[in-house]
Design a protein with these regions (language model features):
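Short, thiol/selenol-centered motifs that function as redox-active sites or metal-ligating centers
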Residues: 34, 49, 336-342
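Polytopic transmembrane helical bundles with strong interfacial aromatic enrichment
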Residues: 1-314
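Gly/Gly-Pro-rich "capping" loops immediately C-terminal to redox-active cysteine motifs
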Residues: 328-332, 338-383
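C-terminal capping alpha-helices of c-type cytochrome domains
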Residues: 369, 382-401
């Protein structure tokens, strides 16, 4: 799709470094989100009347790393603007930028094999990339409008509306993109909402506080209220997004015929778990939440359990002989049928690219099997050079026939 001539080795290094950066930044962002929500929920009225008179709205005592901490939160601002002032924003920005870079390296550069599955939707690489980017932008715009309209009247209705966005995105992505990419698309859309919350709402609200203090005026209350609302939303979205990040390793979810419904169920469960801890922070222990969470996960696991192992049998017909028969045997023993569709091998996997639709050349199959690509592992060392040649020859000769 994109005019980049990258070797598989170079792509692997880009994948490694960008993925590493993405995980590091994500940990920092999630950690700060969890910490500040917990801190806000643990604040209590100041014990000293002097503190209340200075505009302090809450305080908390903490112990960590061998020492005590006394945290004070002002209702509006301190008497004097402190310097330096620590901001929490680059964790979010770096997470999104590295995540989008990863989306480009793994899915947009290789859209024809990783983003598109023509057995799902007959899209060109360019169309798939444009739709993907459009969903990222459109998802944020719709969410932001809902927050500024419905969210001003009812948090419950807003929560239902946000769930509706997630359901629509999950279903739509499952009908447009390759199964594995569909989950990442939904996670990327939610992650874009979270990062945009920080960039367009939360940080501008903080700047309003700073400017108001410098100008000696009362800050506008609405930006602060919106910032708090979006911060809470980000907190609840963290675990659903983390699931989409790790989902590529579990084809039992995105490879299912009802993959979109599984995604919605597990994202709701993730947000439900987050709700348990947020309640704990205010002294409410709702043990029925982990009980219903365990029951929900068990129900999903039972409902999606395959009736039998993926078929790797041979389509009835004239039996293959010689190298073709050997290649078909390697295709079966290496587990290729669990991820790929190849009619002549009786393979109906929906996880990886549909080989009948892609019709890969022998050279391409050799490269992918030897070096891997994206989340497809390398089989170098697991298969002998002869076996790799045999399976490459077999796939290239029967794909699409």
């Amino acid at each position: 799709m994109l005019p980049l001539a990258l070797s598989s080795y170079t792509t692997d290094w880009l994948d490694l470094l960008v993925r590493w950066l993405h995980v590091i930044a994500g940990i920092a962002w999630i950690g700060s989100s969890f910490y500040f929500i917990a801190l806000d929920n643990h604040l209590h009225l100041p014990e000293q009347a002097r503190d209340a008179g200075e505009g302090i709205g809450g305080e908390a005592w903490e112990i960590h790393g061998g020492g005590f901490y006394h945290v004070l939160k002002y209702k509006v601002a301190p008497p004097k603007l402190p310097e330096p002032l620590l901001w929490f924003k680059w964790e979010a920005y770096t997470t999104w930028l590295s995540g989008f870079a990863l989306l480009i390296v793994l899915y947009y550069v290789h859209a024809g094999s990783n983003l598109v599955d023509r057995s799902v939707a007959d899209l060109s690489s360019g169309q798939a990339v444009l739709i993907s980017v459009g969903l990222l932008v459109g998802g944020w715009i719709l969410y932001d409008v809902l927050c500024r309209t419905v969210g001003q009247r009812s948090e419950l209705l807003l929560a239902v509306a946000i769930l509706g966005i997630a359901v629509a995105a999950a279903y739509g992505s499952s009908r447009l993109f390759a199964p594995r990419a569909a989950y990442l698309q939904v996670g990327s859309m939610l992650g874009t909402m979270m990062a945009a919350n920080v960039f367009f709402v939360i940080i501008p609200a903080h700047w309003e506080l700073v400017r108001a203090k410098k100008a000696g005026r009362e800050p506008e209350p609405l930006p602060g209220l919106r910032a708090k609302q979006r911060s809470v939303h980000n907190n609840y979205l963290t675990l659903p997004v983390v699931f989409t990040m790790i989902s590529n390793h579990f084809p039992i979810t995105y490879g299912h015929s009802r993959s979109w419904l599984i995604l919605v169920a597990l994202m709701v469960i993730g947000a439900w778990v987050r709700h348990f801890f947020n309640l704990r922070h205010v002294g409410v222990t709702a043990w029925w939440i982990p009980v219903t969470t365990a029951a929900g996960i068990a129900l999903v696991a039972v409902l999606i359990r395959p009736a039998s192992a993926p078929s790797v049998g041979v389509t009835p017909g004239k039996p293959a002989t010689g190298s073709a028969q050997a290649g078909r045997a390697v295709f079966a023993s290496a587990g290729c049928a669990a991820c790929h569709t190849l009619r002549r091998a009786g393979a109906k996997g929906t996880v990886g690219p549909n080989l009948d639709a892609v019709k890969p050349s022998r050279e391409l199959v050799v490269d992918r099997v030897t070096n891997g690509q994206g989340v497809m592992p390398s089989f170098k060392g697991k298969l002998s050079p002869q076996q790799i040649e045999e399976v490459a020859g077999y796939v290239s000769s029967v794909a699409g026939k």
